Every structure is written in structure tokens, then in C-alpha cells.
Amino acid sequence: MDEKPTTRKGSGFCSLRYALALIMHFSNFTMITQRVSLSIAIIAMVNSTQHQDPANASTEGPVMDLLSNQSRGIKDFSTRAAVYQWSTETQGIIFSSISYGIILTLIPSGYLAGIFGAKQILGAGLLISSLLTLFTPLAADFGVILVIVIRTVQGMAQGMAWTGQFTIWAKWAPPLERSKLTSIAGSGAAFGSFIILCVGGLISQALGWPFIFYIFGSIGCVCCVLWFTVIYDDPMHHPCISVREKEHITSSVAQQSSSPRRSVPIKAMVRCLPLWAIFMGFFSHFWLCTIIITYLPTYISTVLHVNIRDSGVLSSLPFIAASSCTILGGQMADFLLSRNLLSLITVRKLFSSLGLLLPSLCAVALPFVTSSYIATIVLLILIPGTSNLCDSGFIINTLDVAPRYASFLMGISRGFGLTAGIISSTTTGFLISQDSESGWRNVFFLSAAVNMFGLIFYLIFGQAEIQSWAKERTLTRL
């Protein structure tokens, strides 16, 4: 794909498109904190004794010693919140319900965002998710069934909010700035994971577990106000954009029409190997990422024998690394493109290779360094950090090959990713239940193998040119 080096015109971090990227960063931050809130709160929701156990309180680790006196003094507040008798099986159903909800709306919401406008679809999803977060403590009082229903609907709302972002970027992001803008927006999820893991437990101890939902649900409502105020579907209709920036964006994306359409070329998509390369990349990427997100606290606790409070802080460190690598990767990718140092497909394959190969090497090395506390933590930080370099690779490749259908295809891509996450979580649970030491080794070896499969497939079939079926056709009637 040939692109004119016009990035300097109308560019700059003070431009409106970067403000949109920050709002999307905030919205992704909000959604991930709302999604993970229950994972933090449920420890207090179902356990009436652990947070009061003197033995647990007296076991200090290397990270949280300075907070020990404060945490002991404020524990009594958490006893005011209700405690529920939910079995581990019931908790598993509650956790998985939001993922099933996301899968239900990923594809249709991406399609509808392309037709009716991403601003309304995404904004509605964010608002619904925030309101349901606020009502989660009340729902818990009415019974576990209502909690499962709310989490499922919340997942459907978040599915609406995740995929439609690419419809906006197809119209707002100049080709030579796509990696940078999407990485700024996408890093909000990693930063949100870092924050919720850091402060979630402290909020529960200080104020009670319901305030985890109240605080992050309220933050989501504030984000909705910013969303509906600042976000517009395209630069042509934004009242605050400068003429210079508008001309820069419209001229940059002129060759990649993303106009609304009423039909989707499903057959052509199914036969398109470059799309399957993207799907396999998502499958591989989400396989290992889901294991890290879901089982990282468990791994740190069981392998390193770290107490719960230290485990929460240590579990948050990889996500600040992931957020940083996402932004740095986007900056580096666009630098290589703007200087014409590498072609677009070379950049996509380079960052995909780094994002799949490096975490695989770290995962394979993990079972051999368990005797070293520092080495284990460093590798655990590097896995999600290097993995997020994929955000400048196949993650945004749909904007290159089919910008008109970017949200629809992003929905399918995330569907592959969530499917991989469900399979990997189930497989991990089975493997570590048989034998902890060999089980973890097999988990990491299998994850590396899946990553290598996705990488090889993408390197062979990945492309960065607009596909023929994704181009807007002009019909001439005789």
C-alpha cells in the first residue's frame, strides 16, 4: 500500500484525534475495571473469615509491609458488607457469564456500528455496563441468578463497546498514525487491569466490597458523559475540529472508503486467507493472555508462596508493563512507516512476531527459574508486556485489509480470541489439577506451541493491502 508522507500536516498530540484516543483509553480503562471488579470483590463476598484471620494478617510480604498497620486498622469496615454462600462451581459460572455475553454481541454490534454509527452503539454499551456495575451489589442480595443475568447482560454491553472502536478509527486515523492512535486507546485495558488489581483489595478492606462496584461504576458514568460530548463518528461532523486537521484526515483516508453498507461479503471473507491469518493471530494471542490474566495471582501464590495482599500487587505489575509496551510499540511502528524504513506489511509482521515469539520464550523459561523469585517475576512481567506488541501487528490489521468492515471483522477476531480464552482456561485448570509442577510446565509449553502456530500462519498468509471484496464499487448502468 502506497501512502503519501503527509503525517506532519495537521499532526500533533494536541489534535482532536489524539483527544479521541485518550477518551477511548479512558473507556477501555473503565470497561476492564468493571469486568475485573467482581474477581477482586468475590474474595470478600464469599469469605466471612479470611479477611479477619489473624494468621493471614500477620504474614507480611516484601511489597506491602508499609501498609500492614493501616490495613489492620481498617479491616473491620469490610465486615459490614454481606457475605454469600456461593460454591466454587457457582463462582465459575458467574465469572464465565460475562465472557459468554461478550461473545453474543461481538459480531452483530460491529456490523450495526458500521451502519448506524459507532458513537451511539459504543456509548450505549458503556452506559449499560456502568449502570449494571452500580447495581451488582443490590443484585447479589436478590440471589445468584440475578448476578449471573446482570453479568451476562453486562458482557453483551461490553461486546458492543469493544468492537465498534475500529469503525471510528477507520474514519479518524490516518494510515501512518493508526498504530499510534489505536495503541493509545488500547493501552487503557492494560492500565485498568493494573489499577483494579492494585486498589481493588484496598477498597474492599477500607470501605467494603460493594464500593468496588460503586466507584468504578461511577467512573464509567463520568466516562459516558465525556464519550457523548467529545466522540463523533467522523471528522466531517465534529464541531470542534480545525479545518487543517479535517483536511489532513479526510485526504489521508480518502483511498480507503469506509462508507456505510447494507451487505457483508461473507463468502469472500471466508475464502480470504489474510483474514484467517488475523483470526489465528487473535486465537494464539488470547490463549496465553487469558491464562496470565486469570491464573497469574494463583501462580504467584502457589509457586512463589506469596500472601494474598502481595500477590495482588505483584499481579498488577505485568499490566503496567503491558500498557507501556502497547504505547511504545505504536510509536515505534508509526515511526518506521512515516520514515519509509519498512513497508506496512513488514511492520505488521515484525510486531506480530515480537508479540508472539518473545512471550513464548518467556513462558517456556518460567518452569526452569521457579527457584529464583526475581527471575520469575521478571518473566511474568515480560510475558504480557511483550505480548501487547501485537497491538501494532495483526490486532489492527483489519484496518489495512478491509477498513469498511473493520468493526465487523474485529468482532469476529475477538470471538476467536474469547474462544481461545475459554479453551485455555479450562485446559489450564485441568492440567494444574493433576499435578501442580508438571501441570504448569505443560501449560506454558502448550501456550508457546499455540503462539508459534499462530505466528507461522500469519507470517505465511498475512497481508496489508485492501482486499478486492473490501473496496467500494461504483456501478454503471447502461
From Swiss-Prot:
It is found in: Apical cell membrane. InterPro entries: MFS, MFS_dom, MFS_Na/Anion_cotransporter, MFS_trans_sf. It catalyses: 3 Na(+)(out) + phosphate(out) = 3 Na(+)(in) + phosphate(in); urate(out) + n chloride(in) = urate(in) + n chloride(out). Keywords: Cell membrane, Glycoprotein, Ion transport, Membrane, Sodium, Sodium transport, Symport, Transmembrane, Transmembrane helix, Transport. The keyword Ion transport applies. PROSITE patterns: MFS. It is a multi-pass membrane protein. The chain crosses the membrane at residues 98-118, 130-150, 183-203, 211-231, 273-293, 317-337, 341-361, 363-383, 405-425, 442-462. Glycans are attached at residues 28, 47, 56, 69. GO terms for biological process: sodium ion transport. Expressed in the liver, kidney, placenta, lung and thyroid (at protein level). GO terms for molecular function: symporter activity; urate transmembrane transporter activity. One of its GO terms (cellular component) is apical plasma membrane. Acts as a membrane potential-dependent organic anion transporter, the transport requires a low concentration of chloride ions. Mediates chloride-dependent transport of urate. Can actively transport inorganic phosphate into cells via Na(+) cotransport. Belongs to the major facilitator superfamily. Sodium/anion cotransporter family. This is Sodium-dependent phosphate transport protein 3. The lineage of its organism: Eukaryota, Metazoa, Chordata, Craniata, Vertebrata. The gene is Slc17a2.
